[in-house]
Amino acid sequence: MRCFKATIAYDGAYFLGYAKQPDKLGVQDKIESALNLLGIKSVVIAAGRTDKGVHANNQVLSFHAQKHWSADKLFYYLAPKLAPHIVLKKLEEKNFHARFDAQKRAYRYLLTKSLKTPFLAPYIACGDYGSLDSLNTALKQFIGKHDFSMFKKEGGAATNPKRIIFNAFAYKASIMGHECVVFKIIGDAFLRSSVRLIMQACVQYSLEKITLAEIKTQINNIKATIRTPIMANGLYLHRVHY
């Protein structure tokens, strides 16, 4: 058997998350089904499991296929079976593990105060976010190594809640004709819904609904103030570093 590394982008609006679902509506379901049509029966491992409605620009996968498959040949036959909501961007033969070999994951979150068209609603979150300075003040609190037990939803395969955030910041950008705030956060890995809970905490602080002390208290696992993640539709798994 040969091990392959695939880089894909997908529209999270059409799936119930990355992981397999009972009704076969997960990204993993779609990919494994497409491989099965080619006679390839393999579990597909992802660098990160995204929630329902979360998108990916550069999700990385690893899986195995028979030796008669070259990367070029497999790309040719697999890409059309994933389209249109999953795009196979790159495929190469590589002996690695998509999840365990990943060193950093980078996420981006797009937020605008108002949408000019409903057709962008699945891809840009809409809501007030206060000031850019306040958002960056809050984001800085998360940089470093922390126990994120109070910044995760129940479930998921992770047993160690400690994670390292290498960088987290926000900036303004014009995206598809909309003035947006773009959050960027880079960590070694993230717990279930952790990124969205962090984004929610930062927005609520910027809107003066919670204090910086309350964020620190939650980071230190003393008391949880933020329990509901921010909307999923603005979140993108942007890049995975190996």
UniProtKB/Swiss-Prot annotation:
Assembly, per entry: Homodimer.
This protein's record includes keyword Glycoprotein: no
Protein name in the entry: tRNA pseudouridine synthase A
Role played: Formation of pseudouridine at positions 38, 39 and 40 in the anticodon stem and loop of transfer RNAs.
Keyword Isomerase: yes
Source organism (scientific name): Helicobacter acinonychis (strain Sheeba)
Alphabetical keyword list: Isomerase, tRNA processing
Active-site residues from the entry: D51 (nucleophile)
Signal peptide: none
HAMAP family named in the record: TruA
Gene it is expressed from: truA
